[in-house]
Regions:
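ABC ATP-binding cassette signature C-motif
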Residues: 1-81, 137-367
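Flexible nucleotide-interacting loop at or near the entrance of a catalytic core
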Residues: 72-163
């Protein structure tokens, strides 16, 4: 009768997310779902519950409706607050001028009580706590990476990708598509030398500085060190004030900057790992599922930061909103091959549907 879902799309590939969406759309019971995937919420939600200042506020509609309605509410609250502030200022001025004048003292006291009774409307916090930015990287060569006859995998007997021949050009913003287990992470690891090519070559352009983020990189964070300690380890000569200012843009302000990693949530650790990548000013970003564990505000801030990033990037993500906002080229990994995908995410969904139909037909033939 009731489905309680807590981040159900984490670690699912796009094919499985679409399957889950279709199931939830046809589900006749009640669904209470926590998710940071806005496109996912748009498909089946009829109401959004938002935690605001220790209260729950209900909005009718899906996530896109919620964004619009909340923006309208904020606008109206701001207008009301300006009117109330003007009224308060006028009343306060009256009190200051006449509170000690006998003929007006009683009126002034009444005005003071009115001021105490008047409660300012609490305007919803529309400002994101995150204001992240990837610094402009140093200008580099036109060919960032040249992949020739590349076989990727873990050994001669465990080759995942075969005969990859692709080139990454300065300014490229690549979204990697493919089902889980097809080799997206394997390709990323090979590009950043975590894995050696089984055969073939990966040639990086001169002066290329890679910024690599993956979920397993969180394990490389030292539990006893703070966010501030991690940046100090990278840049011994930096002033603490500058490091704190930078960390503040990732919402590590005040005591948060000195909190030990072992006491951080998964989302905070992911933010710190991204901060470390951003601080090093890479000219090639390799991002493997960067939005896992991130809340919607941080996802939006990351999307904005990546949209203005001037280096090249390759992104693995099942967050369609992020892919559509960032990637201007798509590479498809399927059945051990990597190739450019001519189409958008809607075309990719149709590609997946076609693959599923073909798979079912083969099963029926066997039966």
């Amino acid at each position: 009768d009731v489905l309680l879902l807590d981040e159900p799309t984490n670690h699912l590939d796009l094919d499985t997310i679409i399957f889950l969406e279709n199931y939830l759309k046809s589900f006749e019971g009640t669904i209470l779902c926590i998710s940071h995937d806005r496109d996912f919420l748009d498909t089946f939600c009829s109401h959004i519950l938002h935690f605001e200042s220790n209260h729950l506020v209900m909005y009718t509609g899906n996530y896109s409706d919620y964004e619009r309605l909340r923006a309208e509410r904020i606008k109206n609250e701001k207008a009301n607050r300006r009117r109330e502030e003007a009224s308060l200022a006028h009343m306060q001025d009256f009190v200051e001028r006449f509170r000690y004048k006998a003929s007006k003292a009683k009126q002034a006291q009444s005005m003071l009580k009115a001021i105490d009774r008047l409660k300012l409307t609490a305007v919803t916090q529309e400002e994101s706590p995150y204001h992240i930015k990837f610094a402009d990287p140093e200008r580099t060569v036109d060919i960032i990476a040249d992949l020739k006859e590349l076989d990727c995998g873990y050994s001669e007997n465990d080759i995942i990708l075969k005969k990859v021949n692709l080139m990454l050009i300065a300014g490229d913003r690549i979204g990697l598509l493919g089902r889980n287990g097809q080799g997206k992470s394997t390709l990323i690891k090979t590009l950043c030398s975590v894995l050696k090519p089984v055969h073939g070559t990966v040639t990086l352009g001169k002066g290329i500085k890679i910024g690599y983020f993956a979920q397993h990189e969180l394990d490389q964070l030292s539990g006893q060190m703070s966010a501030l300690d991690h940046l100090r380890a990278i840049d011994h000569n930096a002033k603490e004030k500058d490091l704190r200012t930078f960390l503040g843009s990732f919402s590590f302000s005040g005591d948060k900057a000195t909190q030990k990693v072992e006491d951080m949530s998964g989302g905070e650790q992911a933010r710190l790992a991204l901060a470390i990548v951003a601080y090093q000013k890479p000219n090639l970003l390799l991002l493997d599922e960067p939005t896992n564990h991130l809340d919607l505000d941080m996802r939006e801030a990351l999307s904005l930061a990546l949209s203005t990033y001037k280096g090249a990037l390759i992104l693995v993500s099942h967050d369609r909103h992020l892919l559509e906002a960032i990637a201007d080229k798509l590479w498809l990994i399927d059945d051990g091959n990597v190739s450019e995908f001519n189409g958008d995410l809607n075309d990719y969904q149709e590609f997946l549907n076609k693959k599923n139909r073909e798979y079912k037909e083969k099963l029926n033939e066997k039966i």
